[in-house]
Protein backbone atom coordinates (compact mmCIF):
# COMPACT_ATOMS: atom_id res chain seq x y z
CA UNK A 1 0.00 0.00 0.00
CA UNK A 2 1.25 3.48 -0.89
CA UNK A 3 0.70 6.02 1.86
CA UNK A 4 0.09 8.68 -0.80
CA UNK A 5 -3.02 6.72 -1.85
CA UNK A 6 -4.08 5.77 1.68
CA UNK A 7 -6.59 7.57 3.89
CA UNK A 8 -5.38 8.00 7.48
CA UNK A 9 -6.07 11.58 8.61
CA UNK A 10 -3.83 11.97 11.67
CA UNK A 11 -4.12 14.86 14.11
CA UNK A 12 -2.00 16.34 16.89
CA UNK A 13 -4.85 17.06 19.29
CA UNK A 14 -6.96 14.47 21.10
CA UNK A 15 -10.70 14.93 21.66
CA UNK A 16 -11.49 16.73 24.91
CA UNK A 17 -13.54 13.80 26.23
CA UNK A 18 -10.86 11.20 25.43
CA UNK A 19 -9.35 10.24 28.79
CA UNK A 20 -7.87 6.86 27.84
CA UNK A 21 -4.87 6.35 25.53
CA UNK A 22 -6.84 3.99 23.28
CA UNK A 23 -9.55 6.60 22.69
CA UNK A 24 -6.98 9.33 22.03
CA UNK A 25 -4.76 7.33 19.68
CA UNK A 26 -7.60 5.72 17.72
CA UNK A 27 -8.95 9.19 16.88
CA UNK A 28 -5.57 10.90 16.42
CA UNK A 29 -4.17 8.01 14.38
CA UNK A 30 -7.06 8.02 11.92
CA UNK A 31 -8.39 4.58 12.86
CA UNK A 32 -11.94 5.70 13.68
CA UNK A 33 -14.08 8.83 13.61
CA UNK A 34 -16.70 9.63 16.23
CA UNK A 35 -20.06 10.61 14.68
CA UNK A 36 -22.22 10.66 17.81
CA UNK A 37 -22.37 9.56 21.42
CA UNK A 38 -20.90 6.04 21.43
CA UNK A 39 -21.01 5.84 17.61
CA UNK A 40 -17.96 5.48 15.36
CA UNK A 41 -17.08 5.19 11.68
CA UNK A 42 -14.17 2.88 10.87
CA UNK A 43 -11.55 4.40 8.59
CA UNK A 44 -9.23 2.13 6.53
CA UNK A 45 -6.76 1.51 9.40
CA UNK A 46 -9.59 0.68 11.79
CA UNK A 47 -11.27 -1.60 9.27
CA UNK A 48 -8.02 -3.48 8.65
CA UNK A 49 -7.63 -4.02 12.40
CA UNK A 50 -11.26 -5.09 12.72
CA UNK A 51 -10.91 -7.63 9.91
CA UNK A 52 -7.58 -9.02 11.17
CA UNK A 53 -9.02 -9.70 14.61
CA UNK A 54 -12.15 -11.21 13.05
CA UNK A 55 -10.04 -13.52 10.91
CA UNK A 56 -8.16 -14.88 13.94
CA UNK A 57 -11.45 -15.44 15.76
CA UNK A 58 -13.01 -17.19 12.76
CA UNK A 59 -10.02 -19.47 12.24
CA UNK A 60 -10.04 -20.68 15.83
CA UNK A 61 -13.84 -21.01 16.05
CA UNK A 62 -13.92 -23.01 12.81
CA UNK A 63 -11.07 -25.19 14.06
CA UNK A 64 -13.17 -25.93 17.17
CA UNK A 65 -16.04 -27.14 14.98
CA UNK A 66 -18.35 -24.13 15.28
CA UNK A 67 -20.40 -23.06 12.25
CA UNK A 68 -20.67 -19.44 11.13
CA UNK A 69 -24.11 -17.89 10.57
CA UNK A 70 -25.43 -14.33 10.43
CA UNK A 71 -28.48 -13.15 12.36
CA UNK A 72 -30.50 -10.07 11.50
CA UNK A 73 -29.43 -7.07 13.57
CA UNK A 74 -33.12 -6.30 14.10
CA UNK A 75 -34.98 -8.95 16.12
CA UNK A 76 -38.69 -9.41 16.72
CA UNK A 77 -39.78 -8.09 20.08
CA UNK A 78 -42.05 -11.11 20.34
CA UNK A 79 -39.02 -13.41 20.69
CA UNK A 80 -37.74 -11.29 23.56
CA UNK A 81 -41.15 -11.44 25.22
CA UNK A 82 -41.10 -15.23 24.91
CA UNK A 83 -37.76 -15.41 26.74
CA UNK A 84 -38.94 -12.94 29.39
CA UNK A 85 -36.13 -10.47 28.68
CA UNK A 86 -38.13 -7.78 26.86
CA UNK A 87 -38.79 -5.93 30.13
CA UNK A 88 -36.00 -7.37 32.28
CA UNK A 89 -33.17 -6.09 30.09
CA UNK A 90 -33.87 -2.47 30.96
CA UNK A 91 -33.33 0.74 29.00
CA UNK A 92 -30.14 -0.53 27.37
CA UNK A 93 -32.34 -2.57 25.02
CA UNK A 94 -33.32 -0.30 22.12
CA UNK A 95 -36.96 -1.00 21.31
CA UNK A 96 -38.97 0.39 18.41
CA UNK A 97 -42.17 -0.20 16.43
CA UNK A 98 -42.53 -0.51 12.68
CA UNK A 99 -45.31 1.12 10.63
CA UNK A 100 -47.62 -1.79 11.46
CA UNK A 101 -47.09 -1.23 15.19
CA UNK A 102 -45.06 -4.44 15.64
CA UNK A 103 -42.42 -4.49 18.38
CA UNK A 104 -38.76 -4.89 17.42
CA UNK A 105 -35.38 -4.56 19.12
CA UNK A 106 -31.88 -3.84 17.87
CA UNK A 107 -30.02 -6.79 19.29
CA UNK A 108 -27.40 -6.35 22.02
CA UNK A 109 -27.10 -10.17 22.03
CA UNK A 110 -28.86 -12.98 20.17
CA UNK A 111 -29.92 -15.83 22.46
CA UNK A 112 -33.54 -15.48 21.35
CA UNK A 113 -32.68 -15.45 17.65
CA UNK A 114 -30.43 -18.49 18.05
CA UNK A 115 -33.17 -20.47 19.80
CA UNK A 116 -35.68 -19.48 17.12
CA UNK A 117 -33.23 -20.62 14.43
CA UNK A 118 -33.11 -24.22 15.69
CA UNK A 119 -36.60 -24.48 17.22
CA UNK A 120 -38.66 -26.97 15.25
CA UNK A 121 -35.72 -27.80 12.97
CA UNK A 122 -33.34 -29.58 15.33
CA UNK A 123 -35.74 -32.19 16.71
CA UNK A 124 -33.58 -35.16 17.77
CA UNK A 125 -30.62 -35.80 20.05
CA UNK A 126 -28.94 -37.26 16.95
CA UNK A 127 -28.59 -33.72 15.57
CA UNK A 128 -26.72 -32.54 18.66
CA UNK A 129 -24.39 -30.99 19.67
CA UNK A 130 -24.51 -27.88 17.50
CA UNK A 131 -22.45 -24.70 17.88
CA UNK A 132 -23.40 -21.64 15.79
CA UNK A 133 -21.60 -18.29 15.83
CA UNK A 134 -21.59 -14.96 14.05
CA UNK A 135 -19.54 -11.76 13.92
CA UNK A 136 -22.02 -8.94 13.64
CA UNK A 137 -23.11 -5.47 14.74
CA UNK A 138 -24.77 -5.06 18.13
CA UNK A 139 -26.38 -2.08 19.84
CA UNK A 140 -26.72 -1.31 23.53
CA UNK A 141 -28.22 2.04 24.50
CA UNK A 142 -25.67 2.85 27.20
CA UNK A 143 -26.64 5.67 29.54
CA UNK A 144 -23.06 7.01 29.54
CA UNK A 145 -21.06 5.84 26.51
CA UNK A 146 -17.40 6.58 27.17
CA UNK A 147 -13.82 5.43 26.64
CA UNK A 148 -14.12 5.22 22.85
CA UNK A 149 -14.49 1.69 21.52
CA UNK A 150 -14.30 0.26 25.05
CA UNK A 151 -17.87 1.32 25.82
CA UNK A 152 -19.70 2.44 22.73
CA UNK A 153 -23.37 2.02 21.94
CA UNK A 154 -22.82 0.32 18.59
CA UNK A 155 -20.18 -2.40 18.56
CA UNK A 156 -19.07 -5.57 16.80
CA UNK A 157 -19.24 -8.84 18.67
CA UNK A 158 -18.55 -12.49 18.04
CA UNK A 159 -21.45 -14.28 19.69
CA UNK A 160 -21.87 -18.04 19.63
CA UNK A 161 -24.62 -20.38 20.85
CA UNK A 162 -24.34 -24.12 21.42
CA UNK A 163 -27.10 -26.70 21.89
CA UNK A 164 -26.75 -29.97 23.83
CA UNK A 165 -28.61 -33.00 25.12
CA UNK A 166 -26.72 -33.41 28.41
CA UNK A 167 -24.98 -31.37 31.09
CA UNK A 168 -21.81 -33.35 30.46
CA UNK A 169 -21.77 -32.39 26.79
CA UNK A 170 -22.48 -28.74 27.62
CA UNK A 171 -19.55 -28.75 30.05
CA UNK A 172 -17.34 -30.34 27.36
CA UNK A 173 -18.22 -27.56 24.90
CA UNK A 174 -17.79 -24.89 27.59
CA UNK A 175 -14.28 -26.20 28.29
CA UNK A 176 -13.56 -26.35 24.55
CA UNK A 177 -14.63 -22.72 24.13
CA UNK A 178 -12.45 -21.71 27.09
CA UNK A 179 -9.49 -23.36 25.39
CA UNK A 180 -10.43 -21.80 22.04
CA UNK A 181 -10.69 -18.32 23.53
CA UNK A 182 -7.31 -18.81 25.19
CA UNK A 183 -5.83 -19.63 21.77
CA UNK A 184 -7.42 -16.53 20.24
CA UNK A 185 -6.13 -14.12 22.87
CA UNK A 186 -2.71 -15.76 22.88
CA UNK A 187 -2.47 -15.32 19.10
CA UNK A 188 -3.38 -11.66 19.55
CA UNK A 189 -0.46 -11.26 21.96
CA UNK A 190 -2.54 -10.34 25.01
CA UNK A 191 -1.74 -10.85 28.70
CA UNK A 192 -5.07 -12.23 29.92
CA UNK A 193 -6.70 -14.32 32.62
CA UNK A 194 -9.87 -16.42 32.53
CA UNK A 195 -11.80 -15.47 35.68
CA UNK A 196 -14.96 -16.63 37.43
CA UNK A 197 -17.75 -14.17 36.76
CA UNK A 198 -21.35 -13.20 37.37
CA UNK A 199 -23.77 -14.15 34.59
CA UNK A 200 -25.61 -10.81 34.65
CA UNK A 201 -28.58 -10.25 32.33
CA UNK A 202 -27.58 -13.24 30.17
CA UNK A 203 -28.44 -15.63 33.01
CA UNK A 204 -27.55 -19.26 33.50
CA UNK A 205 -24.73 -20.57 35.63
CA UNK A 206 -21.05 -21.32 35.37
CA UNK A 207 -19.68 -18.29 33.54
CA UNK A 208 -16.13 -17.10 32.94
CA UNK A 209 -14.80 -13.76 31.75
CA UNK A 210 -11.57 -13.26 29.85
CA UNK A 211 -9.79 -10.24 31.26
CA UNK A 212 -6.81 -8.46 29.73
CA UNK A 213 -4.66 -7.13 32.57
CA UNK A 214 -4.28 -3.36 32.16
CA UNK A 215 -3.74 -0.49 34.58
CA UNK A 216 -6.63 1.41 32.97
CA UNK A 217 -9.02 -1.52 33.36
CA UNK A 218 -12.56 -0.78 34.52
CA UNK A 219 -13.05 -4.16 36.22
CA UNK A 220 -11.56 -5.29 39.53
CA UNK A 221 -10.32 -8.87 39.52
CA UNK A 222 -8.76 -10.95 42.26
CA UNK A 223 -5.95 -13.30 41.24
CA UNK A 224 -4.28 -15.89 43.43
CA UNK A 225 -0.54 -15.37 43.75
CA UNK A 226 0.04 -19.12 44.15
CA UNK A 227 -2.29 -20.77 41.60
CA UNK A 228 -4.38 -19.96 38.50
CA UNK A 229 -7.56 -19.03 40.39
CA UNK A 230 -8.94 -15.65 39.34
CA UNK A 231 -12.37 -14.05 39.60
CA UNK A 232 -14.20 -10.82 39.02
CA UNK A 233 -14.95 -9.16 42.38
CA UNK A 234 -18.65 -9.64 41.63
CA UNK A 235 -18.20 -13.42 41.76
CA UNK A 236 -14.99 -13.90 43.76
CA UNK A 237 -14.88 -16.62 46.41
CA UNK A 238 -12.47 -17.06 49.29
CA UNK A 239 -11.40 -19.57 51.89
CA UNK A 240 -13.66 -18.99 54.94
CA UNK A 241 -12.03 -16.70 57.47
CA UNK A 242 -11.28 -17.57 61.08
CA UNK A 243 -10.52 -15.32 64.02
CA UNK A 244 -8.23 -15.77 67.00
CA UNK A 245 -10.11 -13.08 68.89
CA UNK A 246 -12.00 -14.16 71.99
CA UNK A 247 -15.67 -14.92 71.36
CA UNK A 248 -18.43 -13.41 73.53
CA UNK A 249 -19.69 -15.58 76.36
CA UNK A 250 -23.45 -15.96 76.71
CA UNK A 251 -26.17 -18.42 75.79
CA UNK A 252 -28.56 -16.61 73.46
CA UNK A 253 -29.12 -13.97 76.13
CA UNK A 254 -30.88 -10.70 75.41
CA UNK A 255 -29.02 -7.53 76.44
CA UNK A 256 -30.06 -3.91 76.66
CA UNK A 257 -27.79 -1.96 74.28
CA UNK A 258 -29.02 1.65 74.27
CA UNK A 259 -28.11 3.58 71.09
CA UNK A 260 -25.71 0.84 69.91
CA UNK A 261 -26.87 1.02 66.30
CA UNK A 262 -23.67 0.40 64.35
CA UNK A 263 -21.39 -2.62 64.29
CA UNK A 264 -18.64 -0.47 65.78
CA UNK A 265 -20.96 0.58 68.62
CA UNK A 266 -21.95 -3.03 69.36
CA UNK A 267 -18.37 -4.34 69.25
CA UNK A 268 -17.20 -1.61 71.62
CA UNK A 269 -20.19 -2.12 73.94
CA UNK A 270 -19.44 -5.84 74.37
CA UNK A 271 -15.66 -5.43 73.96
CA UNK A 272 -15.47 -8.08 71.21
CA UNK A 273 -14.19 -8.29 67.66
CA UNK A 274 -16.55 -7.21 64.87
CA UNK A 275 -15.94 -10.72 63.49
CA UNK A 276 -18.48 -11.99 66.06
CA UNK A 277 -21.16 -9.42 65.21
CA UNK A 278 -23.81 -9.94 62.53
CA UNK A 279 -24.39 -6.94 60.29
CA UNK A 280 -27.83 -6.33 58.75
CA UNK A 281 -27.84 -4.56 55.38
CA UNK A 282 -31.31 -3.42 54.32
CA UNK A 283 -32.06 -3.01 50.62
CA UNK A 284 -35.13 -2.38 48.51
CA UNK A 285 -35.43 -5.00 45.80
CA UNK A 286 -37.17 -3.91 42.61
CA UNK A 287 -38.93 -6.55 40.54
CA UNK A 288 -40.98 -6.36 37.36
CA UNK A 289 -44.26 -6.24 39.28
CA UNK A 290 -43.39 -5.22 42.86
CA UNK A 291 -40.89 -3.76 45.32
CA UNK A 292 -39.95 -5.11 48.74
CA UNK A 293 -37.36 -4.69 51.48
CA UNK A 294 -34.80 -7.49 51.70
CA UNK A 295 -32.28 -7.89 54.54
CA UNK A 296 -28.81 -9.38 54.02
CA UNK A 297 -26.78 -10.62 56.98
CA UNK A 298 -22.96 -10.74 56.90
CA UNK A 299 -20.21 -10.68 59.51
CA UNK A 300 -19.61 -7.30 61.06
CA UNK A 301 -16.17 -6.90 59.51
CA UNK A 302 -17.35 -7.94 56.03
CA UNK A 303 -19.01 -5.89 53.31
CA UNK A 304 -22.01 -6.86 51.22
CA UNK A 305 -21.25 -7.48 47.53
CA UNK A 306 -24.14 -5.81 45.68
CA UNK A 307 -24.20 -8.09 42.62
CA UNK A 308 -24.19 -11.22 44.78
CA UNK A 309 -27.03 -9.75 46.84
CA UNK A 310 -29.05 -8.92 43.74
CA UNK A 311 -28.57 -12.45 42.42
CA UNK A 312 -29.59 -13.92 45.78
CA UNK A 313 -33.00 -12.25 45.74
CA UNK A 314 -33.32 -12.35 41.91
CA UNK A 315 -34.18 -8.66 41.71
CA UNK A 316 -33.96 -6.46 38.63
CA UNK A 317 -32.31 -3.80 40.77
CA UNK A 318 -31.25 -3.19 44.37
CA UNK A 319 -31.27 0.23 46.02
CA UNK A 320 -30.72 1.36 49.60
CA UNK A 321 -33.88 1.08 51.69
CA UNK A 322 -35.07 4.44 53.00
CA UNK A 323 -36.18 5.05 56.59
CA UNK A 324 -39.77 4.96 55.35
CA UNK A 325 -39.16 1.63 53.58
CA UNK A 326 -37.64 0.15 56.74
CA UNK A 327 -40.48 1.37 58.96
CA UNK A 328 -43.13 0.11 56.54
CA UNK A 329 -41.51 -3.35 56.58
CA UNK A 330 -41.72 -3.39 60.39
CA UNK A 331 -37.95 -3.44 60.86
CA UNK A 332 -35.92 -1.69 63.53
CA UNK A 333 -32.87 -0.07 61.95
CA UNK A 334 -29.70 -0.76 63.90
CA UNK A 335 -31.22 -3.64 65.84
CA UNK A 336 -32.21 -6.09 63.10
CA UNK A 337 -31.17 -9.75 63.33
CA UNK A 338 -32.08 -13.09 61.72
CA UNK A 339 -33.38 -14.69 64.94
CA UNK A 340 -37.15 -14.43 65.06
CA UNK A 341 -37.32 -12.23 61.97
CA UNK A 342 -40.71 -12.70 60.31
CA UNK A 343 -42.64 -11.43 57.30
CA UNK A 344 -39.49 -10.08 55.64
CA UNK A 345 -37.32 -11.75 53.01
CA UNK A 346 -33.77 -12.20 54.26
CA UNK A 347 -30.56 -14.01 53.35
CA UNK A 348 -27.50 -15.01 55.37
CA UNK A 349 -23.94 -15.23 54.11
CA UNK A 350 -22.60 -18.75 53.66
CA UNK A 351 -19.70 -18.14 56.06
CA UNK A 352 -22.17 -17.59 58.91
CA UNK A 353 -23.71 -21.06 58.48
CA UNK A 354 -23.21 -22.90 61.79
CA UNK A 355 -21.37 -19.97 63.41
CA UNK A 356 -21.56 -19.89 67.21
CA UNK A 357 -21.29 -17.22 69.90
CA UNK A 358 -22.51 -14.47 67.61
CA UNK A 359 -24.11 -11.11 68.46
CA UNK A 360 -27.07 -9.85 66.44
CA UNK A 361 -29.95 -7.43 66.71
CA UNK A 362 -32.99 -8.65 68.67
CA UNK A 363 -35.46 -6.91 66.30
CA UNK A 364 -36.36 -4.61 69.18
CA UNK A 365 -35.07 -1.09 69.74
CA UNK A 366 -31.99 -0.96 72.01
CA UNK A 367 -31.66 -4.76 72.35
CA UNK A 368 -29.23 -7.37 71.01
CA UNK A 369 -28.90 -11.14 71.38
CA UNK A 370 -25.52 -12.50 72.52
CA UNK A 371 -24.32 -16.10 72.10
CA UNK A 372 -26.43 -16.83 69.03
CA UNK A 373 -25.85 -19.95 66.91
CA UNK A 374 -26.63 -19.47 63.22
CA UNK A 375 -28.49 -22.72 62.71
CA UNK A 376 -31.99 -23.99 62.12
CA UNK A 377 -32.57 -21.76 59.09
CA UNK A 378 -33.80 -23.04 55.74
CA UNK A 379 -30.84 -23.79 53.46
CA UNK A 380 -32.28 -21.46 50.83
CA UNK A 381 -31.49 -18.57 53.19
CA UNK A 382 -27.75 -19.10 52.81
CA UNK A 383 -26.00 -17.41 49.89
CA UNK A 384 -22.55 -16.15 48.98
CA UNK A 385 -22.94 -12.46 49.86
CA UNK A 386 -19.59 -11.03 50.94
CA UNK A 387 -17.23 -8.79 49.03
CA UNK A 388 -13.90 -10.61 48.76
CA UNK A 389 -10.91 -8.33 49.29
CA UNK A 390 -7.21 -8.27 48.53
CA UNK A 391 -5.37 -10.32 51.14
CA UNK A 392 -8.20 -12.83 51.58
CA UNK A 393 -7.24 -16.46 50.98
CA UNK A 394 -7.72 -18.36 47.73
CA UNK A 395 -10.61 -20.88 47.85
CA UNK A 396 -8.56 -23.34 45.80
CA UNK A 397 -5.10 -23.37 47.38
CA UNK A 398 -5.20 -20.93 50.31
CA UNK A 399 -2.74 -18.51 48.71
CA UNK A 400 -3.09 -14.73 48.94
CA UNK A 401 -5.54 -13.00 46.61
CA UNK A 402 -4.19 -9.90 44.86
CA UNK A 403 -6.38 -7.15 43.38
CA UNK A 404 -5.70 -6.23 39.75
CA UNK A 405 -7.36 -4.17 37.05
CA UNK A 406 -8.67 -5.81 33.91
CA UNK A 407 -10.66 -5.14 30.76
CA UNK A 408 -13.22 -7.74 29.73
CA UNK A 409 -12.75 -9.01 26.16
CA UNK A 410 -14.74 -12.25 26.27
CA UNK A 411 -17.40 -14.03 28.30
CA UNK A 412 -18.63 -17.63 28.17
CA UNK A 413 -21.74 -19.03 29.86
CA UNK A 414 -23.43 -22.31 30.64
CA UNK A 415 -27.04 -21.22 30.16
CA UNK A 416 -28.76 -24.54 30.81
CA UNK A 417 -32.38 -24.54 29.62
CA UNK A 418 -33.21 -20.95 30.62
CA UNK A 419 -34.00 -19.79 27.08
CA UNK A 420 -35.01 -23.06 25.44
CA UNK A 421 -37.57 -23.88 28.15
CA UNK A 422 -39.02 -20.35 28.10
CA UNK A 423 -39.29 -20.42 24.31
CA UNK A 424 -40.48 -24.04 24.07
CA UNK A 425 -37.49 -25.18 22.01
CA UNK A 426 -37.31 -28.95 22.47
CA UNK A 427 -35.96 -32.19 21.01
CA UNK A 428 -36.56 -35.91 21.50
CA UNK A 429 -33.92 -37.67 23.61
CA UNK A 430 -32.72 -41.26 23.11
CA UNK A 431 -35.74 -42.51 25.08
CA UNK A 432 -38.22 -40.56 22.98
CA UNK A 433 -38.90 -37.99 25.72
CA UNK A 434 -39.40 -34.31 24.92
CA UNK A 435 -36.73 -32.13 26.55
CA UNK A 436 -35.59 -28.51 26.22
CA UNK A 437 -32.12 -27.94 24.78
CA UNK A 438 -29.26 -27.25 27.15
CA UNK A 439 -27.41 -24.19 25.88
CA UNK A 440 -24.10 -22.40 26.14
CA UNK A 441 -23.26 -18.94 24.82
CA UNK A 442 -19.89 -17.41 24.05
CA UNK A 443 -19.03 -13.77 23.30
CA UNK A 444 -15.94 -11.82 22.21
CA UNK A 445 -15.89 -8.03 21.77
CA UNK A 446 -14.25 -7.55 18.37
CA UNK A 447 -14.33 -3.74 18.28
CA UNK A 448 -13.43 -3.59 21.97
CA UNK A 449 -10.32 -5.67 21.30
CA UNK A 450 -8.93 -2.94 19.05
CA UNK A 451 -8.98 -0.51 21.99
CA UNK A 452 -7.80 -3.12 24.49
CA UNK A 453 -4.68 -3.85 22.45
CA UNK A 454 -3.73 -0.19 22.64
CA UNK A 455 -4.40 -0.03 26.39
CA UNK A 456 -2.12 -3.04 26.80
CA UNK A 457 0.64 -1.74 24.50
CA UNK A 458 1.36 1.97 23.98
CA UNK A 459 3.67 4.78 25.04
CA UNK A 460 3.33 8.56 25.18
CA UNK A 461 3.84 8.84 21.41
CA UNK A 462 1.18 6.41 20.27
CA UNK A 463 0.21 2.80 19.60
CA UNK A 464 2.63 -0.13 19.72
CA UNK A 465 1.00 -2.92 17.72
CA UNK A 466 2.07 -6.50 18.11
CA UNK A 467 3.04 -8.00 14.76
CA UNK A 468 0.23 -10.58 15.14
CA UNK A 469 -2.43 -7.91 14.71
CA UNK A 470 -0.78 -4.79 13.27
CA UNK A 471 -2.54 -3.05 10.35
CA UNK A 472 0.75 -3.37 8.42
CA UNK A 473 3.83 -5.38 9.39
CA UNK A 474 6.36 -2.76 8.31
CA UNK A 475 6.51 0.76 6.95
CA UNK A 476 9.14 1.93 4.48
CA UNK A 477 9.81 5.64 5.02
CA UNK A 478 11.40 7.68 2.23
CA UNK A 479 12.86 10.76 3.86
CA UNK A 480 13.72 12.62 0.62
CA UNK A 481 11.65 12.09 -2.53
CA UNK A 482 14.29 13.98 -4.56
CA UNK A 483 16.83 11.22 -3.92
CA UNK A 484 16.10 9.17 -7.05
CA UNK A 485 18.37 6.29 -6.06
CA UNK A 486 16.82 6.09 -2.60
CA UNK A 487 13.29 6.20 -4.01
CA UNK A 488 14.15 3.47 -6.54
CA UNK A 489 15.59 1.25 -3.80
CA UNK A 490 12.59 1.83 -1.52
CA UNK A 491 10.07 0.84 -4.19
CA UNK A 492 12.06 -2.22 -5.25
CA UNK A 493 12.17 -3.35 -1.61
CA UNK A 494 8.45 -2.61 -1.32
CA UNK A 495 7.63 -4.82 -4.31
CA UNK A 496 9.90 -7.62 -3.07
CA UNK A 497 8.25 -7.62 0.36
CA UNK A 498 4.77 -7.70 -1.17
CA UNK A 499 5.69 -10.70 -3.31
CA UNK A 500 7.04 -12.41 -0.20
CA UNK A 501 3.66 -12.00 1.54
CA UNK A 502 4.70 -9.18 3.88
CA UNK A 503 2.03 -6.60 4.70
CA UNK A 504 3.90 -3.39 3.89
CA UNK A 505 3.08 0.29 3.46
CA UNK A 506 5.48 2.76 1.88
CA UNK A 507 5.38 6.39 2.94
CA UNK A 508 5.85 8.15 -0.39
CA UNK A 509 3.97 11.29 0.63
CA UNK A 510 5.38 14.70 -0.17
CA UNK A 511 5.63 15.54 3.53
CA UNK A 512 8.40 16.62 5.86
CA UNK A 513 10.44 13.84 7.42
CA UNK A 514 9.24 14.86 10.89
CA UNK A 515 5.60 14.41 9.87
CA UNK A 516 6.32 10.93 8.54
CA UNK A 517 8.15 9.87 11.71
CA UNK A 518 5.45 11.29 13.97
CA UNK A 519 2.80 9.36 12.04
CA UNK A 520 4.84 6.15 12.29
CA UNK A 521 5.13 6.57 16.06
CA UNK A 522 1.45 7.51 16.44
CA UNK A 523 -0.01 4.74 14.27
CA UNK A 524 2.42 2.20 15.67
CA UNK A 525 3.44 -0.24 12.92
CA UNK A 526 5.82 -2.81 14.49
CA UNK A 527 8.79 -1.88 12.29
CA UNK A 528 9.99 0.85 9.94
CA UNK A 529 12.77 0.87 7.36
CA UNK A 530 14.10 4.40 6.91
CA UNK A 531 15.74 5.29 3.60
CA UNK A 532 17.52 8.53 4.47
CA UNK A 533 20.80 10.40 4.16
CA UNK A 534 22.90 7.32 4.90
CA UNK A 535 21.61 5.59 1.79
CA UNK A 536 24.33 7.41 -0.15
CA UNK A 537 26.75 5.20 1.82
CA UNK A 538 24.71 2.05 1.23
CA UNK A 539 23.08 2.20 4.69
CA UNK A 540 19.47 2.27 5.89
CA UNK A 541 17.96 2.44 9.37
CA UNK A 542 15.81 -0.32 10.86
CA UNK A 543 13.46 0.96 13.61
CA UNK A 544 11.55 -1.17 16.12
CA UNK A 545 8.44 0.66 17.34
CA UNK A 546 8.46 -1.01 20.77
CA UNK A 547 11.15 1.03 22.47
CA UNK A 548 11.99 2.97 19.28
CA UNK A 549 15.36 1.26 19.00
CA UNK A 550 17.30 2.05 15.81
CA UNK A 551 19.83 -0.07 13.98
CA UNK A 552 21.88 1.00 10.97
CA UNK A 553 22.21 -1.87 8.49
CA UNK A 554 23.44 -2.46 4.97
CA UNK A 555 20.76 -1.56 2.43
CA UNK A 556 21.27 -4.89 0.69
CA UNK A 557 20.48 -6.63 3.98
CA UNK A 558 17.15 -4.85 4.53
CA UNK A 559 14.93 -7.58 3.03
CA UNK A 560 16.51 -10.31 5.17
CA UNK A 561 16.35 -8.17 8.33
CA UNK A 562 12.64 -7.45 7.86
CA UNK A 563 11.78 -11.09 7.14
CA UNK A 564 13.72 -12.29 10.18
CA UNK A 565 12.00 -9.75 12.43
CA UNK A 566 8.58 -10.94 11.31
UniProtKB/Swiss-Prot annotation:
Output one GO BP term: prolyl-tRNA aminoacylation
Where found? Answer: Cytoplasm
Give the first-level EC class, as a single word. Answer: ligase
Q: Which CDD domains would you find in this protein's record? A: ProRS-INS, ProRS_anticodon_short, ProRS_core_prok
Major site of localization recorded for this protein: cytoplasm
List the taxonomic lineage.
Bacteria, Pseudomonadati, Campylobacterota, Epsilonproteobacteria, Campylobacterales
Gene Ontology cellular component? Answer: cytosol
Gene3D superfamilies in the record: Anticodon-binding domain, Bira Bifunctional Protein, Domain 2, YbaK/aminoacyl-tRNA synthetase-associated domain
Any idea which GO molecular function terms this record carries?
aminoacyl-tRNA deacylase activity; ATP binding; proline-tRNA ligase activity
Catalytic activity line of the entry: tRNA(Pro) + L-proline + ATP = L-prolyl-tRNA(Pro) + AMP + diphosphate
Instruction: Identify the domain of life.
Output: Bacteria
How is this protein named in the record? Proline--tRNA ligase
Amino acid sequence: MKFSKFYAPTTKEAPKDASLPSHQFLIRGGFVEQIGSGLYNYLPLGKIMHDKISRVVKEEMNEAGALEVSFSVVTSGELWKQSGRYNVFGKELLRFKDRKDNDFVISPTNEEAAVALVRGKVTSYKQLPLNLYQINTKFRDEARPRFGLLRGREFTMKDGYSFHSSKEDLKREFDLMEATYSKIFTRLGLNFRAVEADSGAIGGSGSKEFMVLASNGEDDILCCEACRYAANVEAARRKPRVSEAEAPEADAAKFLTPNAKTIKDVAEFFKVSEFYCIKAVMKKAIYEDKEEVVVFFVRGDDELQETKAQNACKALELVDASEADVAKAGLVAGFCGPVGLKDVKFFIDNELRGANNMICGANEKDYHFVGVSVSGFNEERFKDLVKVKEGDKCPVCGGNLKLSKGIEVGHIFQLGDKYSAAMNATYLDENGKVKPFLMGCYGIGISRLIAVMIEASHDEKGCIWKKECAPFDVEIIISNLKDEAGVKFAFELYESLKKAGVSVIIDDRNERFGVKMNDFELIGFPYALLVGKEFANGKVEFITRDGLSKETIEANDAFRKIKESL
